[in-house]
Amino acid sequence: CIRDRLGGDLEGDSEEEFDEMFEVNFKGPLRLVRETLPELRKTGTGRIINVVSLAGKRPRNPKILGYSASKFAAMSLTNAIRISGWDDGVRATSVCPGMVRTRMTDEITVPDGEFKMEPEAIAETISYALTLPNSAAVAEILVNSRLESMF
């Protein structure tokens, strides 16, 4: 997400707020895939990694409903890519991290003794998924932290 905050409160945020999250978290990746999928098919080993979120996998906070729903949509997109591209060697994976130290989470305080994951941990996870052979396909990788209940 390139936004600077989580959002989409069930009872408080506007419909425009929800639209913005779907524009960034679902429609943006959809447009990129539509542009690149034909070339990825030609390679026979194309790879697509969507960074989703545990919030899209297991939403627990109604204050970030829009964020969670848009990330769930991104996960659905990844599943559609994986099925559509399978016979042409295209593999797609959703990486679903928990709380990561980013600009978006800067304002979120965590309980004593807890910590946010570093972005490098997610980068390593993505790198791993990209190196798998075509015979090994991973639909999703959940990267939990002890802060999962905050999502």
Residue ranges and their predicted role:
Residues 33, 70:
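Active-site helix of classical SDR
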Residues 53:
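Residue(s) in the substrate-gating loop at a strand-loop-helix junction
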Residues 9-10, 14-22:
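Substrate-binding pocket helix/loop in short-chain dehydrogenase/reductase
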Residues 58-59, 80-90:
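Active-site-adjacent segment of SDR/Rossmann-fold oxidoreductases
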Residues 13, 59-68, 80, 109:
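Active-site loop-to-helix junction immediately N-terminal to the catalytic Tyr of the SDR YXXXK motif
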Residues 1-2:
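Short, small-residue-biased leader/transition segments that mark boundaries at the very start
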Residues 87-90, 94, 111-151:
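C-terminal helical subdomain
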